[in-house]
């Protein structure tokens, strides 16, 4: 099924209409924040996911035209039966809102700064953001750096991160940023009916130097850009499942033996919370098939690891064969950790 607003892939009826996650959240924000928009053109702008709808006035009008109707600010993903249900529902809604805000920053801004991973973790404002315009250069270097930054910012907003030691925090982010980016691109590609990972505006995830290195043998590139999205298509992963999987992956205390005892306890306790929430979601959506669904979802991690490792290896090979080619410092930090 496709979203009746922007034609992206859709799985649920939101506010009475089959719509995608992005349009659902756009409509929700507009209504509940009483936002007003004006069309700069002739009130007939094209609203399509491939062009990343820019006219909010026409987008909202289309939402109304196709029959979207707001219920109340207490509109929930699942029915509320008790306090446990309330906490579960609040968790899902908070994650959806947080992710939506993060994705908006990713596609709406860019930066010319070149800080290291450590610099950003210590003070993310060092990455001075500039709003994109139609004239903004949209190359793979810019998008990959911004994707990594957006993933770092997303996780930094969780309170438990502030409790971690600096060295443990750096290790945790070095391991997870590329994997989180891979999952994010897979979810976007899946939502937009794309067969492989791409950046917005269909910008390739590989620099031209990688194609030059591979020549006519692009099987590895096709595997890296296609295998994760293939798994998403196979499992028909929902937005809520993706968001919980992301946190289950991030809170993995076993990625190194060097974490402090305190960090291991914090990560393990939070991973248990997100694992429990994911299993509960499976129970609500799939009933008796919940254990099978839960196991299938966790199998995504193995494929993500393989894709990230292949990407890191290719990046290393590019730099070996073309010493003049340099990734930004943030990407160098991430790739060097994957290969260490």
Curated annotation (Swiss-Prot):
Covalent S-S links between cysteines: none
Zinc finger (NR C4-type): 3-23, 39-58
Pfam family, one: Hormone_recep
Primary residence: nucleus
Keywords carried by this UniProt record: DNA-binding, Metal-binding, Nucleus, Receptor, Transcription, Transcription regulation, Zinc, Zinc-finger
GO molecular function annotation: DNA-binding transcription factor activity; RNA polymerase II cis-regulatory region sequence-specific DNA binding; zinc ion binding
InterPro entries tied to this protein: HNF4-like_DBD, NHR-like_dom_sf, Nucl_hrmn_rcpt_lig-bd, Znf_hrmn_rcpt, Znf_NHR/GATA
Subcellular location as annotated: Nucleus
Entry-linked Gene3D superfamilies: Erythroid Transcription Factor GATA-1, subunit A, Retinoid X Receptor
DNA-binding region: 1-75
Keyword hit for Transcription: yes
Keyword Nucleus among UniProt keywords: yes
Record-level GO cellular component terms: nucleus
Alphabetical list of CDD domains matching this protein: NR_DBD_HNF4A
Domain called NR LBD: residue spans: 98-337
Family according to the record: Belongs to the nuclear hormone receptor family.
Physiological role: Orphan nuclear receptor.
Name of this protein: Nuclear hormone receptor family member nhr-268
Name of the gene encoding the protein in the UniProt record: nhr-268
